[in-house]
Regions:
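Bacterial N-terminal signal peptides that target proteins for export
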Residues: 1-9
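Hydrophobic helical h-region of N-terminal Sec-dependent signal peptides
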Residues: 10-14
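N-terminal signal peptide c-region/cleavage motif recognized by signal peptidases
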Residues: 18-20
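Tandem repeat scaffolds
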Residues: 24-250
Length: 250
């Protein structure tokens, strides 16, 4: 009997701690609902779906597990904000400053990050399927195992990004920059990398099957054991790329 009571107390305490960790600040939420900015605020677990928060300052704000479905955050200041495990499907973040923001385990599928800055952001295991990243700054992002199938990321800058084991199948990456990026064992099947800059990138064991690499720059890229079967490579510039054991036959 005493043992069962002890277990019940522990369970209730655990639930209380969990809810406390994700309980947003009522004053912060009310301020946002009344049109104010909220830098450094606590909006964890809050439902802000469909709201227009464009242009506001949310620097270092906690959005952990918040609901931001179809929320507008265009040109918002979101540096160092935490969106861990948040729902951002169909959200609009055009031109937003998201430098060093935390999107680990977040779902931002179908969202619009056109012209946004995500420099140094944490996107590990983030869901970004069918998102728009046109002309976005993704320099030095950490995106291991991120799911980005079907993204529109033409002219985006992924310089020195860390993208091992990421999923970028059927993505539009025309004129994108991956200079020095780590794409080890990444999935890029059927993606369009026409005129992309992949110089000095790490593509070992990556899958580029049936991708488009016309006029792409691959000088000094590491393509050991990469699968390039069926890829279109008209006028591709390999320079001194490392192609040891790469699969090139159709």
């Amino acid at each position: 009997m005493r043992k069962n009571i002890f277990k019940t107390v522990l369970t209730l305490l655990a639930r209380g701690i969990s809810s406390t960790c994700l309980a947003y600040s009522n004053s912060d939420l009310n301020a946002v609902l009344n049109g104010a900015s909220c830098p450094g605020g606590d909006l964890s677990g809050a439902d802000l779906s469909g709201m227009d928060l464009s242009g506001r300052d949310f620097t270092n704000t906690d959005f952990t597990e918040a609901r931001l479905d179809a929320t507008k955050l265009d040109k918002a200041k979101l540096q160092d904000a935490c969106f861990q495990s948040a729902l951002l499907t169909r959200a609009s973040l055009r031109g937003a400053d998201l430098a060093h923001a935390n999107f680990r385990y977040a779902n931002a599928s179908g969202s619009d990050f056109t012209n946004a800055s995500l420099q140094g952001a944490y996107l590990n295991r983030c869901q970004l399927r069918d998102a728009h990243l046109l002309n976005a700054n993704l320099q030095q992002v950490k995106a291991q195992e991120a799911s980005m199938d079907g993204v529109q990321a033409d002219y985006a800058d992924f310089s020195f990004a860390n993208l091992p084991y990421s999923w970028l199948r059927r993505a539009s990456l025309k004129n994108a920059v991956f200079h020095g990026a780590n794409l080890y064992s990444a999935h890029l099947e059927r993606s369009d990398l026409t005129e992309a800059d992949l110089r000095s990138s790490k593509l070992g064991h990556s899958n580029l099957n049936n991708s488009k690499l016309d006029k792409a720059l691959l000088d000094k890229a590491v393509l050991e054991y990469a699968d390039l079967r069926g890829a279109e490579m008209n006028y591709t510039q390999f320079g001194t790329a490392f192609l040891d054991n790469a699969k090139l036959d159709k």
